């Protein structure tokens, strides 16, 4: 099965971007709660 590189990159970005956004948002709220 031939893998489409653009499809792999698009899927990776589609997963990584929201995940990193939620992670940063969680870290911000956690740091605010600590202080």
Curated annotation (Swiss-Prot):
Transmembrane domains' residue ranges: 5-25
Membrane topology, as annotated: Single-pass membrane protein
SUPFAM superfamilies: Photosystem II reaction center protein M, PsbM
Gene Ontology biological-process entries: photosynthesis, light reaction
Subcellular localization(s) per the UniProt record: Plastid, Chloroplast thylakoid membrane
Major subcellular site: plastid
InterPro entries: PSII_PsbM (IPR007826), PSII_PsbM_sf (IPR037269)
S-S bonds: none
Record bears the keyword GTP-binding: no
This protein's UniProt keywords: Chloroplast, Membrane, Photosynthesis, Photosystem II, Plastid, Reaction center, Thylakoid, Transmembrane, Transmembrane helix
Pfam families xrefs: PsbM
Keyword Zinc-finger attributed: no
Subunit structure, as described in the record: PSII is composed of 1 copy each of membrane proteins PsbA, PsbB, PsbC, PsbD, PsbE, PsbF, PsbH, PsbI, PsbJ, PsbK, PsbL, PsbM, PsbT, PsbX, PsbY, PsbZ, Psb30/Ycf12, at least 3 peripheral proteins of the oxygen-evolving complex and a large number of cofactors. It forms dimeric complexes.
Family: Belongs to the PsbM family.
NCBIfam families: PS_II_psbM
Record protein name field: Photosystem II reaction center protein M
């Amino acid at each position: 099965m031939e893998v489409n590189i653009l499809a792999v990159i698009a899927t990776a970005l589609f997963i990584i971007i929201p995940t990193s956004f939620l992670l940063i948002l969680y870290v911000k709220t956690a740091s605010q709660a600590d202080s």
